[in-house]
Amino acid sequence: FSIEDILARVIWGEAEGEGADGMQAVGNVIMNRVERDSKYDADAQDIVMEYKQFSSVGDPKRLEAMMNLSKDNPEYIQALEISKKLLAGEMEDITNGATHFYNPNTAAKYDWIDEYPVTFKLKNHWFAKGK
């Protein structure tokens, strides 16, 4: 898989059914982490594969769905276009610098939730800027 493809599959895995804005916002979080971690020479693949950072990667069933996702799937095609634009630096950050996101209705009570300010809300996801 190319870096564009990996990023697209994780974007789809995290934001399936959330539309283009939801996919862009998830992609923004990933790219914000790449920027934050640039001193460690991290790229998008390093960020998404980091242990327990993205639930779709850590869930075996979800990961299998992501890996078997058809390249003809309309949401995959949309996620791939978003991925390419994000990697080229051609998309604005609609999350205002968020480095985390969660669904407040279903997320476990993470210790960082109260510490990181919410910067953006979209449908079922809240986006927050970490340290």
What are these regions (language model features)?
Residues 1-131:
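Bacterial extracytoplasmic/cell-wall-associated proteins, especially those involved in peptidoglycan
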